[in-house]
């Protein structure tokens, strides 16, 4: 147990005496005896674990904590065994053995882990033996432990080990605790002789395949920002796999022996020890903090664990981000160690056992030469070094290795990557400035094959961060939010991967416009460099777009780009967030939105490249972030800007275009009477006619006509659009100042995420509001049923059948994860973004019902919402409202703005409890009557 002093954890002798006293005092009272025994053992266990926790906080040693808890559990189990065989089943002493298996067998136990026990029996065990084991198990269960157990004879263990790899692995880690020790010794001896001997390759192949499947299920990257510490890539289970393989193949009892065998260097062994200790510390803290076997390092506990580790905030990086960077660097070290061990195993197998197949053996043939290369050879589809001195002779060969692998479509031999990792010191300033090295790197980056795969291998081997030190600074860097799913380096590589897919013409269904534009991009090199470097300056105090452009300017010269190419890269990085923000937070029907954006872009070539970069950036954030709705917004912004840059922006008067739209609608309703057509087209103001597509106007016409015939003051209509990934809910209702607030609240209560709102008023005083919500189901039928449920919720709230505060409260109960984040509320009020409207932009932590409360406050302030754009970035929401006062004018005056800002911030800080209680329900009058708006335009829409 690593020479630890356990005396302060538990006084074993005292505990045994206490248990014996319980037996003595309750000889004829079995029920009381059991309860008293349970109380004594539970108290000892609880106090011992608390002392282990205190020691963890004091010395920070994760393995020491796991050793302490394992030792404590050994003593509890031994005392329980002694009690059972001395006082309950006295004939069963030394009739069976109790052994630990699994992680517990390695002398390590996390606070919330299962206790895995193997009870070894003599042949033909007596019934009393089973009862003694049952007594022990029931006491352990009653103590609150999750006990995984098996009762077998030695012969049964051997037989099962031959066919069951899980049982074989468990016995491999077996450790004696108490009882008849010769049974454990016999099993260990027979296991080595009958199971292990000659089956090394089979076991190794099974364990590596098991590891790959586990990675696939947990997320096949070690850079997920909520990693599974036990099962995830680079986690404890990967280290356990190394231990199993080492013990099985090399017959080592301690991983330190791998250094003596030449498998690991002393430095690599120290990395292994540090990784093991760190991951155990994280895991123990997680279990103590949550009070359960929590294995996912989720957002809501990351901050507290970072604090427990003693991390502090530094410029550009918070304490939790620094802690998580440490975690991901450790996970990377685990990957390095895995490759090194696999390389050693292959080398050993090649020397000793010919003819192996599968994962381990690929050495039963001669290496093949690679055309045009003397430094490297091919080994069954994998690139290998021609000799061990390749990198020392010419460090450029480190970069060349990856280039040759790319152009020949080769995987990497583990030994080659091991030697790369051990040669990282050769990547110095001379190599970084070497023209040939940079030429090779640019060839890798812009490859028509699979650049992301090669870049990822370079990154995993530590080459990318050494060759581009600025990239090295963002390796393993996470951003503490719910929006970004990966570390910054993984995000950048995934961005290149998506660009490569578009470049190869494989994205037509998902990105038809980008797929069409990519072949016409004049400078692929500049675009690829911009994509790789766009977040290179994350983690700095200043704006990462500005800092990143400055970094890129230097790197472009190194990479051999021309001055013109460099300026393109610099501009793209400076503006890489612009198109996304404009598309998602601005009214794209407002001409000033388009003219302002066009002024920043200035050329069609820039527009094309910025669109493609934006798509790649959003897609690479993580699964579920990209959807068809965002694609449609970006396409709309692109087309409108392209038209303006090409000189085709329409200067035809607004009135003429509105009249033409009304005539088109009139003609489209040809099956209506002339009178009905005339009456209907007069219902709509210019904003509706100019911004709503004709096909939607026709649907609205039939919807309104049907509601009128049925005498419905309130009606809803739903449809879904799989390509745009949205579901549309149209609400017809008597107008009301708080209508949007109530609709938004009803959507929140139904669990719908609003992404856009089109708000119109008809000339007879009715509201025709269309809400776009994110699509949840892939199947149209399922999504339409969901949409109908949302529609019913809207009708129930508007008609008063349900109270809004109550239904929203049912959705707000599970907010633990978002509460882990702190986003200072901000309000920006400006008249410069639109010629007609004041734009109010709010940014804060999202929560159920927030949009409803914000729009209610705007109504309270006598502001008329003309259009709204709702955008969520994980836990953060950015809501943009285009508003006027009640007479259609922009908001002016410092006092008015200050009042709006104060009220908005109060809502965002959840201080408007009274407002929530006053949230209206049942605002629809029984008859279809409402105020008649003035003849001037009432509300504008924002369809995309």
UniProtKB/Swiss-Prot annotation:
Protein name: Bifunctional uridylyltransferase/uridylyl-removing enzyme
Keyword annotations of the record: Hydrolase, Magnesium, Multifunctional enzyme, Nucleotidyltransferase, Repeat, Transferase
Keyword Nucleotidyltransferase set for record: yes
Reported induction: Is constitutively expressed, irrespective of the nitrogen content of the medium.
Gene from which the chain derives: glnD
SUPFAM superfamilies for this protein: ACT-like (SSF55021), Nucleotidyltransferase (SSF81301), Nucleotidyltransferase substrate binding subunit/domain (SSF81593), Poly A polymerase C-terminal region-like (SSF81891)
Cofactor annotation: Mg(2+)
Keyword Transmembrane helix included in the entry's annotation: no
Region (Uridylyltransferase): 1-371
Lineage: Bacteria, Pseudomonadati, Pseudomonadota, Alphaproteobacteria, Hyphomicrobiales
Chain intervals for the UniProt region annotation (Uridylyl-removing): 372-727
Organism listed in the record: Rhizobium leguminosarum bv. viciae
């Amino acid at each position: 147990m690593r020479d630890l002093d356990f005396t302060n954890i538990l006084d074993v002798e005292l505990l045994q005496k206490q248990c014996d006293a319980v037996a003595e005092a309750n000889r004829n009272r079995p029920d009381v005896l059991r309860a008293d025994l349970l109380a004594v053992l539970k108290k000892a266990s609880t106090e011992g674990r608390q002392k282990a926790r205190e020691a963890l906080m004091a010395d920070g040693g994760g393995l020491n904590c796991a050793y302490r808890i394992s030792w404590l559990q050994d003593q509890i189990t031994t005392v329980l065994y002694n009690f059972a065989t001395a006082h309950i089943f006295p004939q069963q002493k030394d009739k069976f053995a109790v052994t630990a298996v699994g992680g517990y067998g390695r002398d390590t136990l996390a606070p919330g882990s299962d206790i895995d026990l193997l009870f070894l029996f003599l042949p033909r065990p007596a019934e009393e033996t089973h009862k003694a084991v049952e007594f022990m198990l029931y006491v352990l269960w009653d103590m609150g432990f999750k006990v995984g157990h098996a009762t077998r004879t030695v012969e049964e263990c051997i037989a099962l080990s031959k066919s069951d790899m899980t049982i074989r692995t468990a016995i491999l880690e077996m450790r004696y605790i108490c009882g008849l020790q010769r049974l454990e010794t016999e099993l260990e001896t027979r296991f080595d002789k009958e199971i292990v001997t000659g089956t090394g390759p089979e076991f190794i192949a099974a364990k590596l395949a098991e590891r790959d499947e586990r990675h696939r299920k947990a997320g096949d990257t070690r850079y997920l920002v909520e990693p599974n510490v036990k099962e995830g890539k680079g986690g404890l289970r990967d280290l356990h796999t190394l231990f199993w393989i080492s013990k099985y193949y090399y017959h080592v009892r301690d991983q330190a022996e791998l250094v003596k065998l030449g498998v690991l260097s002393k430095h690599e062994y120290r990395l292994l020890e540090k990784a093991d200790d760190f991951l155990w510390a994280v895991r123990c803290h997680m279990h103590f903090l949550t009070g359960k076997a929590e294995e996912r390092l989720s957002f809501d506990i990351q901050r507290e664990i970072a604090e427990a580790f003693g991390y502090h905030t530094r410029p550009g990086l918070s304490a939790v981000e620094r802690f998580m960077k440490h975690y991901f660097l450790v996970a990377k070290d685990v990957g390095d160690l895995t490759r090194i061990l696999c390389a050693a195993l292959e080398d050993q197998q090649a020397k000793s056992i010919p003819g192996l197949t599968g994962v381990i053996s690929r050495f039963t043939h001669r290496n093949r030469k690679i055309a045009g290369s003397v430094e490297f050879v091919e080994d069954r589809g994998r690139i290998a070094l021609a000799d061990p001195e390749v990198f020392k002779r010419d460090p450029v060969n480190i970069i060349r290795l990856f280039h040759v692998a790319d152009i020949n479509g080769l995987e990497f031999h583990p030994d080659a990557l091991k030697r790369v990792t051990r040669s990282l010191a050769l990547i110095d300033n001379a190599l970084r400035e070497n023209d040939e090295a940079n030429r090779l790197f640019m060839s890798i980056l812009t490859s028509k094959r699979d650049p992301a795969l090669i870049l990822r291998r370079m990154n995993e081997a530590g080459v990318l961060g050494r060759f581009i030190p600025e990239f090295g600074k963002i390796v393993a860097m996470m951003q503490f939010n719910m929006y970004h799913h990966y570390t910054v380096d993984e995000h950048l590589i995934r961005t290149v991967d998506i660009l490569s897919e578009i470049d190869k013409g494989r994205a037509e269904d998902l990105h038809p416009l980008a797929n069409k534009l990519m072949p016409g991009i004049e400078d692929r090199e500049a675009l690829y460099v911009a994509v790789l470097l766009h977040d290179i300056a994350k983690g700095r105090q200043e704006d990462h777009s500005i800092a990143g452009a400055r970094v890129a300017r230097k790197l472009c010269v190194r990479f051999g780009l021309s001055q013109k190419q460099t300026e393109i890269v610099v501009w793209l990085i400076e503006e890489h967030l612009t198109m996304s923000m404009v598309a998602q937070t601005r009214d794209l029907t407002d001409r000033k939105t388009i003219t302002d954006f066009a002024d920043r872009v200035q050329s069609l070539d820039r527009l094309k490249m910025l669109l493609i970069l934006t798509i790649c950036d959003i897609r690479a954030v993580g699964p579920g972030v990209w959807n068809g709705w965002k694609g449609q917004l970006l396409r709309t912004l692109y087309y409108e800007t392209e038209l303006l840059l090409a000189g085709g922006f329409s200067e035809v008067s607004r009135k003429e275009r509105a009249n033409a739209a009304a005539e088109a609608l009139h003609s489209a309703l040809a099956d209506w009477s002339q009178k009905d057509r005339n009456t209907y087209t007069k219902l709509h103001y210019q904003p509706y006619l100019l911004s709503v597509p004709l096909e939607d106007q026709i649907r609205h016409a039939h919807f309104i006509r049907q509601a009128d015939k049925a005498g419905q003051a309130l009606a809803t209509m739903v449809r879904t659009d799989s390509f745009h990934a949205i579901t549309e809910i149209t609400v017809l209702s008597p107008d009301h100042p708080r209508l949007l607030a109530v609709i938004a609240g009803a959507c929140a209560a139904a669990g719908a995420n609003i992404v856009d709102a089109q708000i119109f008023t008809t000339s007879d005083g009715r509201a025709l509001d269309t809400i776009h919500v994110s699509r949840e189901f892939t199947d149209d039928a399922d999504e339409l049923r969901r949409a109908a449920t949302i529609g019913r919720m809207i009708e129930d709230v508007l008609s008063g059948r349900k109270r809004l505060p109550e239904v929203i409260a049912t959705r707000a109960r599970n907010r633990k994860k978002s509460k882990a984040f702190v986003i200072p509320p901000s309000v920006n009020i400006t008249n410069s973004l639109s010629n007609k409207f004041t734009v109010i932009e709010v940014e804060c932590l999202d929560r159920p019902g927030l949009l409803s409360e914000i729009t209610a406050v705007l109504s309270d302030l006598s502001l008329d919402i003309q259009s709204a754009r709702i955008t969520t970035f994980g836990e953060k929401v950015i809501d943009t409202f285009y508003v006027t006062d009640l007479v259609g004018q922009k908001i002016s005056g410092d006092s008015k703005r200050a009042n709006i800002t104060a009220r908005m911030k109060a809502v965002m800080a959840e201080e408007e409890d009274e407002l929530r209680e006053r949230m209206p329900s049942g605002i629809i009058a029984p008859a279809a009557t409402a105020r008649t708006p003035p003849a001037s335009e009432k509300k504008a829409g924002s369809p995309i």
